[in-house]
Every structure is written in structure tokens, then in C-alpha cells.
Amino acid sequence: MANYTAADVKKLREITGSGMLDCKKALEETNGDFDKAVEVLRIKGAKDVGKRAERNATEGLIAVSGNTMVEINSETDFVAKNAEFKEFAQKVADAAAAVKANTPEELAAADLDGKTAADAIQELSAKIGEKLELRRAITLEGEKLSVYLHQRSADLPPAVGVLVAYTGEGEAAQAAAHAAAMQVAALKAQYLTREDVPAEVIEKERSIAEQITREEGKPEKAIPKIVEGRLNGFYKDVCLVEQASVADSKKTVKQVMDEAGVTLTGFARYEVGQH
């Protein structure tokens, strides 16, 4: 008897974009282990695996106060662009900033006009008639901060928010840091430097790169070098300072920052409905 359901096959298709038969084979091969099935399909060349897994039907907005950013969710974009909801979200961001909230629990406990943010959002939810959620919060420490909020359309509130912490002086430094924030919004860097990538993530990527290389039939002696090359490509995709600059594709983000006298010390990126 199969250790998976039709719902598992459907979800795997949505996440990987692979065909039904491939999804069934992957689940059979992994004895129903969903995460391993995703890896199997990725090795076999499924496109956008991992990126689609982050998607969610959730609506809402991103709000920033000082060096704190919050995500608050609604069920529909109709509510997300409601003036009362947007005003409430900014008050929540202010309250979260006051306590330097970094967890959903700290966000929920933040004081909002004498009541917790958790109680306040329940009241607003009852009034609006739609489920609302305090999703997450982060406070980014740093000498200076650049903030970028992106709206998907003019009539909707920000759906992407980025905080970039940096050191540097003058208008050129400010402009460079802002460009870095826009880069994070667009290219979705996951780490600042390759040293920030967890060891388990590196090992997983190395393993996948090796399996792909072997399946391509490359000579055994060439495999280590090819794997390292693919790992370097991975770093250039996910590490901010190693990405090609959107402002000048001939330079890395680090080179652009160095020229402006900027040192990036951290960043955070939120997108509504994503992990």
C-alpha cells in the first residue's frame, strides 16, 4: 500500500511544477517522505522547487517602525488595502518597535493602547469579519538602517519589506545602502555572506550538486571541481555580497558597497505569505 495520498501528489505538483507521474514516482521512491520527494525532483531538474514551496494564499501587508518590521495577514487583499487595517498595522509596528520584538510571541504581547496586540487584532477581526493574523516581527540592530517597502500595485499596501543595516557616511553611502535594500527585495538574498550559510545547508547543496553531476555522466576526477563550481554558483545566488549588482551587473554588491564606503552588517526581508 502506498505511503502517500492523492493530496500529497497534488501538493508536490504545486510545489515543484512536475508532472503527476514524476511526483508519484518520487513519493514511491522515498516511501512517502514529502521533503525527500522534493529533493528527488529537484535533482531530476524540477524548476522553481523550493521557491514555490514558500508561496501561500495569504494576503496582508508589511509595516516598519524604526528598525522593526512586522507582517500582518488578512484573508483578502480587499481588507489589506482597508484604511483601518493599514492604520492598525502601523500601530502594531510602533508597539513592536517599542519592545524590539523578534518573535511572534513578543509581537502578540506588545502593548497597544492598554491591550495586547493579540487582543487588539481579535477585536479588529470581529469588526471587519475576516480572519487577521499577527504573523511575525524582526528587529534589526545596526549603526544605520535603510528601509525599502515595495507595493505590487499602487492600490495595495507594501507586500515586500527590507531592512538593511550598514555603516558608512554621506549621501553616497545612503544611496548605496538603499540600492542594496532594493536588491534584496528583487533578488531575495537569503544570507549576507557565505560564512552565514548554515553547515547543513551547504552539505545539502553539495550533495545535490554531486548527484546532479554524477547523473550527467561527468568523469569521476572532474566531479569535485564541478561540484565546487556549482556551490560557488549557489553562493552567488543566495549571498547578498556575492550577487551581481542590479545597479551595475559587472560588479558584485560588495564591490559597489566598497566603492561607496559602505559595510553591510545585516538585512531582513519579509514578503507577505512567504516563510
From Swiss-Prot:
Molecular functions per Gene Ontology: translation elongation factor activity
Protein keywords: Cytoplasm, Elongation factor, Protein biosynthesis
Subcellular location as annotated: Cytoplasm
Gene3D superfamilies named among the record's database cross-references: 1.10.286.20, DNA helicase RuvA subunit, C-terminal domain (1.10.8.10), Elongation factor Ts, dimerisation domain (3.30.479.20)
Gene Ontology cellular component terms for the protein in this record: cytoplasm
Chain intervals for the UniProt region annotation (Involved in Mg(2+) ion dislocation from EF-Tu): 76-79
Classification via CDD domains: UBA_EF-Ts
Pfam families membership: EF_TS
Alphabetical list of InterPro entries matching this protein: EF-Ts_dimer_sf, Transl_elong_EFTs/EF1B, Transl_elong_EFTs/EF1B_dimer, Transl_elong_Ts_CS, UBA-like_sf
Family: Belongs to the EF-Ts family.
Functional note: Associates with the EF-Tu.GDP complex and induces the exchange of GDP to GTP. It remains bound to the aminoacyl-tRNA.EF-Tu.GTP complex up to the GTP hydrolysis stage on the ribosome.
Name of the protein: Elongation factor Ts
